[in-house]
């Protein structure tokens, strides 16, 4: 029977839901076992019954990427080598590619040794993404899986996807995989009745990871959903732009990547404020990325009052989708850096007229709507 590697991921749910949910996920995983997507990943892999011995290995930390141990899911045959980290440069390979997946070995490290993360080679990230994206599609379409779990699956696949883009660039197969994730985002925001509850209580963010792009995607598409002109194509276009919006930072000096704009010198700030232009240049000429995505990337820091960058566009000269992302980008930074709940970060923005002036009023109004039902709305938007 296929084992499920994610008990820890559902521990925050009420106890009575744990076992039915685990069974539901196991059932979903069983339906994709032996399917085309999994078989393609297993092609050419030497498979073994049972589990190989654990092996201590050395390697550069930059060669590895991590995932929370409670959120690791595997096919019956392990698709790639899986490690735990002993210390910098030292790892133990606890699962070997081709082995039969062993949940007990995972549980030993999670429960007995309190290990929080599993690691795998960045060269195997594409395999992880392909399997995880296929599984996420099934999870999101299931009526039995709660929205919190759906969002967790989507977060993991989006975060690792952005890592892959930043590492490997905009290769055709990577862009196509991004389109699949955009479809998943649409399905989540379009079908879920409990989306407002999820957004109000969302606290699963890590300021040291690429979760930023996922959070921007989730909140941006939720705002777009409030507009009468919203459509699947619009939401998927915005999702792609959200995942790529900071791609221009790949061309910035590495020393600036961990520095906030407020702490930069005038010279470094000028370099930073050019990253939307660099991002647009990177996707320019790529026929797999439509022009709307390119325009959003170059405008995602433009403000409605003309105080943004790189071109200080103002008012109607800014694309609505770009101004939405500008708002959400600011909101996510406030939420994460100040460790605020989403609703508190919203209030922080609304209490500052200078901040509110950066965004089209209708965007701010629709931002409020994603947290509360219109008839319950009591927040007054400051006048611009």
Predicted regions, residues:
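Active-site-flanking alpha-helical
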Residues: 252-253, 306, 336
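Short acidic, Gly/Ser-rich segments with clustered Asp/Glu that frequently serve as metal-coordination loops
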Residues: 248, 332-333
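Phosphate/pyrophosphate-binding active-site loops
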Residues: 267-268, 278-279, 333, 345-348
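Non-catalytic interface/linker regions that flank or bridge core catalytic/transmembrane domains
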Residues: 1-203, 207-208, 384
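Acidic/His-rich, divalent-metal-binding segments that scaffold phosphate/diphosphate chemistry
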Residues: 137-273, 280-285, 291-292
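Acidic-histidine catalytic/liganding microenvironments
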Residues: 13, 112, 227, 286, ...
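Histidine/acidic-rich helix-loop-helix segments that form or flank divalent-metal centers
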Residues: 238-242, 270, 283-325, 340, ...
């Amino acid at each position: 029977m296929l084992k499920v590697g994610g008990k820890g991921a559902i521990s925050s749910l009420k106890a009575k839901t744990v076992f039915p949910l685990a069974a539901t996920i196991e059932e979903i995983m069983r339906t994709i076992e032996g399917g085309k997507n999994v078989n393609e990943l297993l092609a050419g892999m030497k498979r073994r019954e049972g589990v190989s011995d654990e092996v201590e290995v050395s390697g550069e930390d930059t060669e590895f990427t991590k995932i929370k141990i409670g959120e690791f899911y595997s096919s019956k045959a392990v698709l790639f080598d899986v490690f735990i980290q002993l210390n910098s440069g030292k790892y133990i390979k606890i699962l070997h590619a081709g082995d039969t997946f062993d949940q007990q070995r995972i549980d030993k490290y999670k429960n007995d040794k309190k290990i929080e993360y599993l690691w795998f080679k960045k060269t195997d990230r594409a395999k992880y993404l392909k399997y995880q994206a296929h599984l996420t599609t099934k999870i999101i379409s299931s009526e039995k899986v709660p929205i919190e779990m759906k969002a967790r699956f989507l977060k993991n696949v989006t975060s690792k996807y952005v890592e892959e883009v930043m590492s490997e660039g905009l290769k055709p197969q990577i862009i196509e995989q991004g389109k699949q994730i955009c479809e998943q985002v649409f399905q989540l925001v379009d079908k879920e009745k409990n989306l407002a509850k999820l957004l109000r209580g969302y606290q699963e963010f890590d300021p040291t990871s690429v979760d930023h792009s996922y959070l921007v995607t989730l909140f941006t598409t939720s705002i777009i959903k409030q507009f009468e002109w919203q459509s699947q194509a619009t939401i998927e276009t915005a999702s792609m732009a959200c995942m790529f919006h900071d791609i221009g930072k790949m061309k910035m000096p590495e020393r600036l990547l961990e520095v906030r704009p407020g702490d930069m010198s005038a010279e470094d700030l000028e370099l930073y404020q050019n990253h939307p232009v660099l991002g647009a240049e990177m996707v320019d000429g790529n026929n797999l990325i439509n022009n709307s995505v390119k325009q959003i990337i170059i405008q995602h820091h433009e403000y409605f009052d003309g105080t943004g960058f790189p071109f200080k566009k103002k008012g109607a000269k800014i694309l609505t989708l770009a101004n939405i992302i500008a708002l959400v980008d600011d909101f996510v930074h406030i939420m994460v850096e100040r460790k605020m709940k989403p609703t508190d970060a919203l209030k922080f923005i609304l209490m500052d007229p200078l901040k509110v002036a950066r965004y089209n009023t209708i965007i701010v109004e629709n931002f409020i709507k994603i947290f509360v039902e219109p008839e319950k709305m009591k927040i007054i938007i400051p006048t611009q």
